[in-house]
């Protein structure tokens, strides 16, 4: 009993899954198969009657009339069969088109949901912020790499010339008018003293130049 009930319930579930379109197509195919079987039976009956009653004129004439009538019915059945075949094809094609439409509809709804999360204004703002960040990074790279325009380089060179002039003026003061007493030193000591003075002066010059350039940059 339980097995029977399970079979019945399973059959109902399968029926629920069958759509109206499926039932219509199934009925059309059943009618098509019946027409095909009828065509075969009519041909067999017509031939049998014609052969069995050919010896009698009246019966042969009646058989021919029946055969003619059956041929007309066959022609009509062929036409109906063709119409049924076309109708089945149209129904199946319409069902495919409905499925395609539903798929397109679902895809369109999904696309709209995605577009709600990513508006055009948000994309434009993101692109603008990205461009600004890239430009800022390029400016930092140029500053760190020491690239200057021609005008800036000319200004730096002029500033360097002015500093050198000031340093030279400070390095070489005016010669006093009074004559200083001569101090004789050994030749080796005089040469060594001159080298030390020159080294000290050059070192100070370089330090001052570097300090001015750093001050100008920052």
From Swiss-Prot:
Write out the entry's keywords from A to Z.
Coiled coil, Endosome, Membrane, Protein transport, Transport
What's one Pfam family here? Answer: Snf7
Compartment(s) of residence: Endosome membrane
| Membrane topology field | Peripheral membrane protein
| Chief site of localization | membrane
Instruction: Give an example GO cellular component term for this record.
Output: ESCRT III complex
Q: Name one GO biological process term.
A: vesicle budding from membrane
- Coiled-coil annotated spans: 15-42, 70-172
Quaternary structure annotation from Swiss-Prot or TrEMBL: Probable core component of the endosomal sorting required for transport complex III (ESCRT-III).
Question: Which family does the record claim for this protein?
Answer: Belongs to the SNF7 family.
Query: What is the purpose of this protein?
Result: Probable core component of the endosomal sorting required for transport complex III (ESCRT-III) which is involved in multivesicular bodies (MVBs) formation and sorting of endosomal cargo proteins into MVBs. MVBs contain intraluminal vesicles (ILVs) that are generated by invagination and scission from the limiting membrane of the endosome and are delivered to lysosomes enabling degradation of membrane proteins.
- Which named protein is this? Charged multivesicular body protein 6
Q: Show the taxonomic lineage.
A: Eukaryota, Amoebozoa, Evosea, Eumycetozoa, Dictyostelia
Q: Which gene encodes it?
A: chmp6
